[in-house]
A protein has these predicted regions:
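A short helix->beta-strand "capping" segment at the edge of beta-propeller domains
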Residues: 2-11
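Beta-sheet-dominated scaffold domains
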Residues: 11-185
Length: 185
């Protein structure tokens, strides 16, 4: 019997850091770039993977988030990026990026947590700031929708995990001590 079981090795070396579902496609980040995986399910062509971005690899496994049909992430060079299916990877201009990039705790990029607050069209990145130690202590956020679209915000708040409203009525963030906090309540 015919089988569609296969493996696909992404060319170019590096390691796979994370993947996120966008519509019917998978976005797959390596530490070097971004790939789009499309499922065909046919003998001989089960999946197709196309490289859509280079030098925009993901800094950590939780440093990417999808809002609507657009992915947002932090790359290994501490730059913010966006990608919408069918488009191109775009660096996002950030007037407060230097503070983030200069103070991200050394070798702690794996701790960055990207999340959304869809009600306000916001993506946020919680990260370990070297001025505070080695646990997530600060955030940087971008309004991607609404009248504030393009505006960046930053603040001090310890969150190592965050989930948008949906499973519950409000977004919920958790500190490194395990304390949950309801946001926007």
């Amino acid at each position: 019997s015919a089988s569609t079981a296969r493996e696909y090795v992404l060319p170019g070396g590096g390691r796979i850091v994370a993947a996120r579902l966008v519509g019917r496609n998978w976005l797959v980040w390596t530490n070097h770039g971004l790939w789009v995986g499309t499922y065909y399910g046919q003998i001989g062509k089960v999946w197709s993977f196309d490289k859509v971005g280079d030098k925009c690899g993901l800094i950590g496994p939780n440093a990417a988030v999808v809002l609507g049909s657009t992915a947002y992430w932090v790359s290994t060079d501490r730059q913010f990026h966006a990608y919408t299916l069918g488009g191109a990877v775009t660096p996002i201009a950030c007037p407060i990026r230097e503070d983030f990039a200069d103070n991200l705790a050394a070798s702690q990029g794996d701790k960055i947590v990207a999340s959304t607050i869809a009600e306000y069209g916001e993506v946020r990145f919680d990260y370990p700031d070297s001025r505070d130690g080695y646990e997530n202590s600060r955030y940087i956020a971008l309004a991607v929708e609404g009248t504030d679209a393009g505006s960046w915000y930053k603040g001090e708040m310890a969150r190592t995990a965050m989930v948008d409203a949906g499973p519950s009525s409000y977004p919920c963030g958790v500190t490194y001590a395990g304390q949950p906090f309801w946001h926007e309540k």
